Each structure stands twice: as C-alpha cells, then as structure tokens.
Amino acid sequence: MTNASTESFFNRSLADVDPEIFGAIGKELGRQRHEIELIASENIVSRAVLEAQGSIMTNKYAEGYPGKRYYGGCQFVDIAEELAIERAKKLFGVNFANVQPNSGSQMNQAVFLALLQPGDTFMGLDLNSGGHLTHGSPVNMSGKWFNVVSYGVREGDNLLDMDEVARKAEEHKPKVIIAGGTAYSRIWDWKRFREIADSVGAYLMVDMAHIAGLVAGGQHPSPFPHCHVATTTTHKSLRGPRGGVILTNEEDLAKKFNSAVFPGLQGGPLMHIIAAKAVAFGEALQPEFKEYAAQIVKNARALAETLIAGGLDVVSGGTDNHLMLVDLRKKNATGKRAEAALGRAYITCNKNGIPFDPEKPFVTSGVRLGAPAGTTRGFKEAEFREIGNLIVEVLDGLKVANSDDGNAAVEAAVRGKVVNLTDRFPMYDYMG
C-alpha cells in the first residue's frame, strides 16, 4: 500500500467507503427514531456503550483471561475486562463473573459443557410455556445432546406449576434444573426451585437474561444465594451490548465455567464488546438505573391494564416484570397478522405462542410486548397507556377488515399518532 492509500484506509468514512451499508444504517436509525419498540428482548444503548463497542478494542486478540493471555500486548484490554468483571460482580453481589460469552446461547452452552455430559438429564421450562430454545428445545443443541425433561405452566391460570417441577425432578433425577424464561411475566420463586434441586442433588441454573436489569434495579428478587449459577445476556433489560455473562459464588464452579468458555467453546473474546459491557455495568450501578428499572415495571403494568380494558386477554392476567403475552383470539387475530398490522402502524413487536397454543409456531395466537426500550426513551405510564390504546385500535381495525392486508385507514391514522409520540422523545440527536 502506498502512503496515500494507507492514509485513505485509516481516514475514509463509512459513507465514503460503503454507501450501501451507510444507507442501511441511516434507514435503521430512522426506523428506531420513529417507531415504538415493544420487542421485549430489545433495548436502546447509550452513546457511551456505542462508542466502546465501535472502538479500536476490536483490533485486539486476547485469548485467555486477564493476566493469563496467549497473546502479547493485552495490558490495556485487560483493564477493560477486569473492569467488566468487577462491575458485574458488584452489580449482582457475586464472587465470580465470566464476561466473555459472545451470546446468550453460548453462555448457556458453556454451563452445559461444564456441568453435563452428553445424554445427561436436565430440566427446563417448555418453549410453549415461555422457555428458551437453549432450555431443551428439540431443534436446539440442548435438546439434541441431552435428555430433556420439560415443565410448564398450569392451564387454568398460566402460572408455573411448581408441583409438576417437584414431581418430575423426583421422577427423573436431573443433574441440572433451569429456572428462567423468555415469555413468563410473573415473579420466579428461586427458593422453591433450590429446594427442589437440593432434594434430587441437582444444580440450580437460573437464566435471567430477560430480567437481569430488574434484578440489578431491585425490581425482581435476585436468584442469589439460591442458585449455583446464573446466566444473563447484557442487551435486554441491562441495556448493554449484545453478549452474555456467567455468574456464580462458588470458586470450583467458576473454574469450570472459565474453562468451558475458553478454550471449551470460544477462542479470542470480543474485546470491544467486553469494553461496552463494562460501560453498561457501570451505568447500571448508578442510582438512576434503579429508577429506570422501577419505571419499566410501572410501564408494563400500565400497558397490560390498558390492553385488558380494551378487550384483550393478557396471559396470567397481567405482569410483574417488563413483558407480557397477549392472547389475540378475542379479536379474531393471529400473532402473525397482528405483528404485520402493528408493524405497518410503526409499532414493533413479535408474534409469540401462548401456553397451550392451538396455532402453528409461525402463526401463533399471541404477541409478546415489552417495556424496556420505550422506557429508555423516556416513556412513562401515560405514554404506555396511549400505546395500549393504539394497539387496540389497530387490532380492532384488523378485525373489521378481516384481511391479511389489514385496515389501511386505521393503520395510517395510528402511524401518524405514533410519529407524533416518538417525535416528542428524540434519540441520538448527535447523529444528525
């Protein structure tokens, strides 16, 4: 490379080098600014997190752990990882944290690698009751490599059937019991799960990927000291970059998890992401994060109450956390049709199966809604009640139209109201 081309490589902007990608990013920024984000697993990160994630830390390979790397030149990325570890430990009140998992699936796989052998039995919440793919779905590695015993919710009230958990644990003697899910809107009884795990000699693993921000903010009971290990993603209610964390109080387990992450599952960690995790943990340690977590729950409850008043069923009758499942059958709608219609009205959500759902997984009878992203924008109860009424308006219009194409007039009217709302709560002004 000539001096001129080298200078160009280091200094040309994305807009100059790749206008197609630059354009796609610009359009996505517009979508995020003007639409209401209700996907429960999504959030909006701070400028500080974005800057760390987009930093030159991405250039550095750092196989191993701080102070024990297989590459030279790691003295500064060590600072970032050590900060991430210490802040995660402080945030959740634990003795050990591994901040290297690249995703939620990989953090859970690392725990399996550390605690299970192929063919061993573990228990997890059934996907149809609000569990996760990695909790034993037959299409996932967890369901292919291990003997999975699933538990679920009761058909009457859609609450966890703890008697079923105890009965199946006694019958199948699992090595691991997973508590936690992706679409359960009530408080988890960690103490009862630990009692059941102890009764059969199982490890209790808590996947708190969805509720970790609420745990950190004091709005949901901590799984510690009840669990042996907890895993969480960092990009949902924690409001950080995409990635995972493994937490424990037990040194012998911490060593197993470290070995499982590296070299068991991953090679070089993503140091720019770890730096961004450290920033997000630092933000979550501030007093205002507790206010944020409390507002999430208030907003979710306001939304659920509004939807119920509008003639919709909310699974289990409401929510204690950041999310809810909405049963659409009273509106003669499916999750697939509702997701599309709401999307056309600039309200983003995801179709989701409800417990004992008669519809196919790609159709579903429900949608899942969450409050974290809207709360980050500054929405409070009044805005979420307005959003709830807009959702009812779209679904009522869909019912009248009785067409997959929706009700264009209603959706256009709601779309205008959504833009008026989001314009009052701007984001990333510095991006122009």
From Swiss-Prot:
Keywords: Amino-acid biosynthesis, Cytoplasm, One-carbon metabolism, Pyridoxal phosphate, Transferase. Pfam families: SHMT (PF00464). One of its GO terms (biological process) is glycine biosynthetic process from serine. It is found in: Cytoplasm. Disulfide bonds: none annotated. Pathway: One-carbon metabolism; tetrahydrofolate interconversion; Amino-acid biosynthesis; glycine biosynthesis; glycine from L-serine: step 1/1. The record marks 235 as: Plays an important role in substrate specificity. (6S)-5,6,7,8-tetrahydrofolate binds at residues 127, 131-133. CDD domains: SHMT. It catalyses: (6R)-5,10-methylene-5,6,7,8-tetrahydrofolate + glycine + H2O = (6S)-5,6,7,8-tetrahydrofolate + L-serine. Its EC number is 2.1.2.1. Catalyzes the reversible interconversion of serine and glycine with tetrahydrofolate (THF) serving as the one-carbon carrier. This reaction serves as the major source of one-carbon groups required for the biosynthesis of purines, thymidylate, methionine, and other important biomolecules. Also exhibits THF-independent aldolase activity toward beta-hydroxyamino acids, producing glycine and aldehydes, via a retro-aldol mechanism. This is Serine hydroxymethyltransferase.
